[in-house]
UniProtKB/Swiss-Prot annotation:
SUPFAM superfamilies: Troponin coil-coiled subunits (SSF90250). Gene3D superfamilies: 1.20.5.350, 6.10.250.180. One of its GO terms (molecular function) is actin binding. The gene is Tnni2. This is Troponin I, fast skeletal muscle.
Length: 182
């Protein structure tokens, strides 16, 4: 047992050491990635954004603001035009999809709910109001009369068991029982 415990401790110590080394490597990799992203961001901004030259006088600053507002207006107009084009193309796509469904005969059907209909109403709906078809499904069935069996007659004669108990309960019921026995 002592040797086994030492071996287990050595294995856990080795695992702990490997985990800490892996965490250190991961931390350095994250730092490198962060610095790389920062440098890429700076490069992109330096390429795409011209450096800002602020002139000394107020009139030059106002002129710069007017130029920037003009650029903003142009960008907004382009954005609006593109949005209109996108809306127009999406509308055309919907129309074409609808035409395609119409040509194929596949319509989007609304969810149907169950309606109880008689056979006559169903035939009238299918054939239209011009055709008068009466479909009485019970007309061709055989008429069967129920024959009373002896058991059923006995059950009917006995009647409700509650009435029998009520009649026998109390003094009058007991009196009748004695009178009927003698």
């Amino acid at each position: 047992m002592g040797d086994e415990e030492k071996r287990n401790r050595a294995i856990t110590a080795r695992r702990q050491h490997l985990k800490s080394v892996m965490l250190q490597i991961a931390a350095t990799e994250l730092e490198k990635e962060e610095s790389r992203r920062e440098s890429e961001k700076e490069n992109y901004l330096s390429e795409h954004c011209p450096p800002l030259h602020i002139p000394g006088s107020m009139s030059e600053v106002q002129e710069l603001c007017k130029q920037l507002h003009a650029k903003i207006d142009v960008a907004e107009e382009e954005k609006y035009d593109m949005e209109v084009k996108v809306q127009k193309s999406s509308k055309e796509l919907e129309d074409m999809n609808q035409k395609l469904f119409d040509l194929r005969g596949k319509f989007k059907r609304p969810p149907l709910r169950r309606v109880r209909m008689s056979a006559d109403a169903m035939l009238k709906a299918l054939l239209g109001s011009k055709h008068k078809v009466c479909m009485d499904l019970r007309a061709n069935l055989k008429q069967v009369k129920k024959e009373d069996t002896e058991k059923e007659r006995d059950l009917r004669d006995v009647g409700d068991w509650r009435k029998n108990i009520e009649e026998k309960s109390g003094m009058e019921g007991r009196k009748k029982m004695f009178e009927s026995e003698s």
